[in-house]
Amino acid sequence: MGKMIYMDHAATTAVRPEVLDAMLPYFTEKYGNPSGVYTFASKNKDVINVARDIIADSLGAKPEEIYFTGGGSESDNWALKSVVEAFQDKGKHIITTSIEHHAILHTCRYLEKLGFDMTYLSLIHI
C-alpha cells in the first residue's frame, strides 16, 4: 500500500510542530480559564491578548477586531448573524447554496423563522 494522502483539510488539519510546541503548555499545565478571576486564569488571558496583538499586527487590523471562537460552526454562525445584523436596514433576502455547511444551513432556517427570505441555489444553478 502506498503513502496515505489526507484530503479532508476542511474538517481538520495537522498542527505544525512549532505550533504544538507553543501550545503544549496550555494543554497540559497552564490550562486555566482565561475568563476566570484567579491569577492562574489571568495569566492565560494575558497570553491570549499577546496572540491577538500579533495576529492583528500581521493583518493590519486593530486588536479589538480580532475574535477567537471555539471552532468552525461557531464561526459560521457568528459570521452569518453579524452580516444580517450589519445589513438589516438593506432588506431580508439571503442567497446561499444548498450545499453549505450544516452550521450555515441551520442558521438560515432559524433566520427564516425570524422572517428572512432565503434562496437556496442548487449545484445545477452554480
Walk through the language-model features, giving the residues of each.
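Pyridoxal 5′-phosphate
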Residues: M1-I124
